[in-house]
Amino acid sequence: MSLDINQIALHQLIKRDEQNLELVLRDSLLEPTDTVSEMVAELHRVYSAKNKAYGLFSEESELAQALRLQRQGEEDFLAFSRAATGRLRDELAKYPFADGGFVLFCHYRYLAVEYLLICVLNNLSSMRVNENLDINPTHYLDINHADIVARIDLTEWETNPESTRYLTFLKGRVGRKVADFFMDFLGASEGLNAKAQNRGLLQAVDDFTAEAQLDKAERQNVRQQVYSYCNEQLQAGEEIELESLSKELAGVSEVSFTEFAAEKGYELEESFPADRSTLRQLTKFAGSGGGLTINFDAMLLGERIFWDPATDTLTIKGTPPNLRDQLQRRTSGN
């Protein structure tokens, strides 16, 4: 992995009681040893694979102002990280769920792009076997489940300050409160809405195939084409490029897909991140609620699966063998 650490700082927030978070600040930067480099590479890999929200700094953002001064050489990275950890403590202290943790600031370069990663990591307890084959307790950083994470694309921020996607963050497993306090700390607001862009793309594809007067099989083939392209981009860590997608759909209509999307006003960006859960709707129907979970291939609608909107009834002809076996055993038992 072509990842080079420029500077990295680590501090700690310790929760002493319900009201107080204690600051433990390092007096020096971490050395980019092999172990540290391996940890940052793992953080980068895990974070890059997750669905993220996009944001941008507000004009009043204290973090952005301090970061700008640091980038201009008016403050060193360690001082910047120490002051930022203090501001994070002040924000966290407002929330009863605050637990503290290790606060990491890492300025690194990956594939010619500079990033600043800010995250709060926690230790987990586990067991290990030592050289004498004894079992001893141990601790490790829970990188895979870190949810207080943000990353600033410094290259994008400095070369294209009007961008709405230079800052990314995770919304967190415990709901909106995590996102709220972290956004307050960052002094940021939500920017590009990747889910909305993907939903707009799906609607544009459906309308595009309808206007081209394609039959059911042809429409599904187009959806599969779109899904294949978008999934390839997702797997490669690349964004959906409307122009490239339009070339994939050449021949579907006399009008190109990009021209169609622009004329109809879908407000799609020239490129935007793929959203896995939204894109699945191109090839599958899925839903759950009231103790019922249903998931089936889109091509089955109208063939083996029929929906009556008047009665909101779904009729399935031919059940999966394992489901049929369970139903037979349950009904025969009664």
From Swiss-Prot:
Pfam families, alphabetized: NA37
Cross-referenced InterPro entries: Nucleoid_associated_NdpA (IPR007358)
Main location per the UniProt record: cytoplasm
Cellular component aspect of the GO annotation: bacterial nucleoid; cytoplasm
Keyword Cytoplasm carried by entry: yes
Subcellular location(s) of the protein: Cytoplasm, Nucleoid
UniProt-recorded Gene Ontology molecular function terms: double-stranded DNA binding; single-stranded RNA binding
Keyword entries, A-Z: Cytoplasm
Superkingdom of source: Bacteria
UniProt similarity note: Belongs to the YejK family.
NCBIfam families linked to this entry: PRK00378.1 (NF001557)
Entries under HAMAP family matching the protein: NdpA
Identification of the protein by name: Nucleoid-associated protein YejK
Organism of origin: Escherichia fergusonii (strain ATCC 35469 / DSM 13698 / CCUG 18766 / IAM 14443 / JCM 21226 / LMG 7866 / NBRC 102419 / NCTC 12128 / CDC 0568-73)
